[in-house]
Amino acid sequence: MALAAKLLPSIVAFVALACCVLRSSVASVDHHRKLSGWSIGGATWYGPANGSGTDGGACGYQGDVGQPPFNSMIAAGSPSIYESGKGCGSCYQVKCSGNPSCSGKPVTVVLTDLCPGGACLEEPVHFDLSGTAFGAMAKPGQDDQLRNAGKLPVQYARVPCKWQGVDIAFRVDAGSNQYYLAVLVEDEDGDGDLSAVDLMQSGGSGGGGSWAAMQQSWGAVWKYNSGPAPLQAPMSIRLTSGSGRTLVASNVIPAGWQPGGTYRSIVNFRRED
């Protein structure tokens, strides 16, 4: 009993330490989703000085990156925030203060690409911004001077996407056919990213009336193989955001759909204040 009494304080201290480690591990999983303030990262830029990085990128948005609502304000993220494509569509505020040309004011960018090596691996979180986005961090008239710096330390924060007046769009991949459907999902409000996508066909022998999980193909592209039975349109798509919110785009893929076609829904996640 005396030995147990002596060991008790050590046991209590060990349990307390273990709990702290566990809480730290759990917190790190949600680090980029529930940022409570500014964190430190790095930034470079790529593509034309006043451009949108490169067309396409590892998320699959192609030329849309230069159009509304992206408007060239995009970033290629380090693997830690690209998350094998699950980070596609997420929004961040980024600001710099380590250069005389920095305005110190945050700009909002959306993740549309992967920066897999080089400077993007020199710190835990790195943004390879479009030339437009990098220059937007500058004081008025000093965007070229800021871009000449090449690389800068930045502060960043995960923020909700605010695509006002824009509903979610589904672009059917050119390789889709009557047995295989792949869609690029874009313009999600709020979280911006997705953790799951499901498909419901219309009636018939192809699984109509029930939800079937789609698989992430790459980036923001999700796919479904219907097996021996052809796909039955119209088809509905259910989206689950990174934080677990769900949304259904009913009959968004119409009868007579075409590979390469873009079908815009009438729904979107609405930002939670």
Swiss-Prot record:
Please state where this protein is localized: Secreted, Cell wall; Membrane
What cystine linkages occur within this chain?
Answer: C59-C88, C91-C161, C96-C102
State the InterPro entries in the record: Expan_Lol_pI, Expansin/allergen_DPBB_dom, Expansin_CBD, Expansin_CBD_sf, LolPI, RlpA-like_DPBB, RlpA-like_sf
- Domain Expansin-like CBD per the UniProt entry, residue ranges: 179-265
Q: Which SMART domains does this UniProt record tie to the protein? A: DPBB_1
- Choose any GO biological process term that the UniProt entry carries and state it: sexual reproduction
Signal peptide range equals 1-27
| PROSITE patterns the record matches | EXPANSIN_CBD, EXPANSIN_EG45
Residues with an annotated glycan are N50
Sorted keywords for this record are:
Cell wall, Cell wall biogenesis/degradation, Disulfide bond, Glycoprotein, Membrane, Secreted, Signal
The Expansin-like EG45 domain, residue ranges:
56-166
Q: Which CDD domains does this one have?
A: DPBB_EXPB_N (cd22275)
Superkingdom of source: Eukaryota
- Output the Gene Ontology cellular-component terms: extracellular region; membrane
| Protein topology in the membrane | Peripheral membrane protein
Q: Which family does it belong to?
A: Belongs to the expansin family. Expansin B subfamily.
Protein's job:
May cause loosening and extension of plant cell walls by disrupting non-covalent bonding between cellulose microfibrils and matrix glucans. No enzymatic activity has been found. May be required for rapid internodal elongation in deepwater rice during submergence.
**What is the protein's given name?**
Putative expansin-B14
Originating species = Oryza sativa subsp. japonica (Rice)
Lineage of the species this protein comes from? Eukaryota, Viridiplantae, Streptophyta, Embryophyta, Tracheophyta
What's the gene? EXPB14
